[in-house]
Swiss-Prot record:
This is Phospho-N-acetylmuramoyl-pentapeptide-transferase. It is a multi-pass membrane protein. The chain crosses the membrane at residues 26-46, 72-92, 94-114, 132-152, 168-188, 199-219, 236-256, 263-283, 288-308, 338-358. Keywords: Cell cycle, Cell division, Cell inner membrane, Cell membrane, Cell shape, Cell wall biogenesis/degradation, Magnesium, Membrane, Metal-binding, Peptidoglycan synthesis, Transferase, Transmembrane, Transmembrane helix. It comes from Erwinia tasmaniensis (strain DSM 17950 / CFBP 7177 / CIP 109463 / NCPPB 4357 / Et1/99). The keyword Iron-sulfur does not apply.
Length: 360
């Protein structure tokens, strides 16, 4: 919005030309989302407390979590608001990639909101019925996957980028739809599973978004894309604005979500953020990179799959409790230790992922 306005005002004052610079807009996008999140935090927490929108804790969970019962949840609303406002202010409104991410962010946010509402108002720990949650996640993912396919059909935008191999970029064709679907839905649920401790999910999300901001900048730059042997995508640059908005909103939310948390993001936040990261990865053609940089989300999800599979097949559990962060809690690790160590691992994985762009 402000970019469009600046383009019309630059004829009156050349200083408005600064709004055309991607680096400038990336910085102010981050700061805008950060300040909105910090401003909304105390007000939203107070409002959620007034409405008794408190966290519902499962009776079969770790005993240390019983003290979290009643902590305000659905704080993801302020994350989504911060991201959306910042992106609308600083990104080019004509960019289709930006709208694809916002569509998933808001759509999955609505699904998460309904899920949270059932939990906190109806006191139903299961929330939205699983099949309906999956149905709406799938519908949203398929719609945006089809739109993305039509935008980039028969171009590098539908090629598969394989790490370590600079000349291996097969054209996916209609398989693009299937891959996009699984990446978006899978990442959404993976972040949701990770969101079980104070600040555990939001910081890896910030790290991954920051990593993708660098990738988006390189992908949207002809020279750097050629240098790194990745597809040049002319719309990709504006995803930097989306990624930095996620970073800013995430850091602002962490101010209130750090241990001991004053507010939880709820499914309205975790499903939306995961869906947004998955969509960004697909748009940048970096699905494999997401697996590396988002390794914490992958391991959390695999721990649940292995736990359920082992119990059904052998009648035995592999972990004391899944997702795996609960396993370490039950081993006696203090919650802050689990959180910070997962953060460190996440940061390392993002750096490793970025390094793979050059190791080809």
């Amino acid at each position: 919005m402000l970019v469009w306005l600046a383009e019309h005002l630059v004829t009156f004052y050349s200083g408005f030309n600064v709004f055309s610079y991607l680096t400038f807009r990336a910085i102010v996008s981050l700061l805008t989302a950060l300040f909105i999140s910090l401003w909304m935090g105390p007000r939203m927490i107070a409002r959620l407390q007034e409405m008794s929108f408190g966290q519902v804790v499962r009776n079969d969970g770790p005993e240390s979590h019983f003290s979290k019962r009643g902590t305000p949840t659905m704080g993801g609303i302020m994350i989504l608001t911060s991201i959306t406002v910042s992106v609308l202010l600083w990104a080019y409104p004509s960019n289709p990639y930006v709208w694809c991410v916002l569509f998933v962010l808001v759509g999955y946010g609505i699904v998460g909101f309904v899920d949270d509402y059932r939990k906190v108002v109806r006191k139903d720990t299961k929330g939205l019925i699983a099949r309906w949650k999956y149905f709406w996640q799938s519908a949203i993912a398929l719609v945006v996957a089809f739109v993305m396919y039509m935008i980039g059909k028969d171009t590098p935008a539908t090629e598969l980028v394989v790490p370590f191999f600079k000349d291996v970029m097969p054209q996916l064709g209609l398989l693009y739809l299937l891959l996009a679907y699984f990446v978006i839905v899978g990442t959404s649920n993976a972040v949701n599973l990770t969101d079980g401790l104070d600040g555990l999910a939001i910081m890896p999300t910030v790290f991954v978004a920051a990593g993708f901001a660098l990738v988006a900048w390189a992908t949207g730059n002809v020279k750097f894309a050629e240098y790194l042997h990745i597809p040049y995508l002319r719309h990709a640059g504006e995803l930097v604005i989306v990624c930095t908005a996620i970073v800013g909103a995430g850091l602002g939310f962490l101010w209130f979500n750090t241990y001991p948390a004053q507010v939880f993001m709820g499914d309205v936040g975790s499903l939306a953020l995961g869906g947004a990261l998955g969509t960004i990865a697909v748009l940048l053609r970096q699905e494999f990179l997401l697996v590396i940089m988002g390794g914490v989300f992958v391991v959390e999800t695999l721990s649940v799959i292995l736990q359920v599979g082992s119990f059904k097949l052998r009648g035995q559990r592999i972990f004391r409790m899944a997702p795996i962060h609960h396993h370490y809690e039950l081993k006696g690790w203090p919650e802050p230790r689990v959180i910070v160590r997962f953060w460190i691992i996440s940061l390392m994985l993002v750096l490793i992922g970025l390094a793979t762009l050059k190791v080809r």
